[in-house]
Amino acid sequence: GSSGAGKSTLMAVIAGELTPREGMIRSQPHAWLSQRTDLFQDSLRDNLLLASPEATDASLWHALEAAGLASGIRGLQAGLDTRLGEGGLGLSGGQLRRLALARLLLQPHPLWLLDEPTEGLDAATARDVLARLDALGAGRAWLIATHLQREAALADRLLVLRSGRVEAEYSRGSAGFGAALAALRPD
């Protein structure tokens, strides 16, 4: 759906961050990658541990490697102890999304909720993040809220939202799938 169609609201309801006005939502345990990546004035380690408080340093490095952020962090004098946020290291938009991806990967949940996971990233960074999600998301169910072709192209099914309602549904290989994909914003 387009901007304002209700995609992010639907995702927030499924994630349990908003209460539906009517009816009820039941969801599997899930990992939630929202549009906003919160960066706390703390160490990189503690920013990652928000996703999995019991994670070992080895697990943190594995998630950073999988997210494409490890080499940059290894180059920092303090490594995982590098301070982030005000008074510490600032991260670019691409690095923030990769940090969010590392947090996602630290959670072993069977469902991923991804709200515009590459919005605002340059094309090369977006392709890399999506390739990593595709490779690491095997065996999980994904729900992606997007208006971008590059993100929707990963889907097996497309739901088209307008004004908060599902207007259409297409399965990969069906007659309308390609047209629905083409109607989304190109890279």
Describe the function of each predicted region.
Residues 101:
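Hydrophobic anchor residue at the start of the ABC signature
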Residues 15:
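Helix-to-loop junction immediately C-terminal to a conserved catalytic motif
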Residues 45-85, 130-131:
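ABC ATPase nucleotide-binding domain helical subdomain, centered on the C-loop/LSGGQ "ABC signature"
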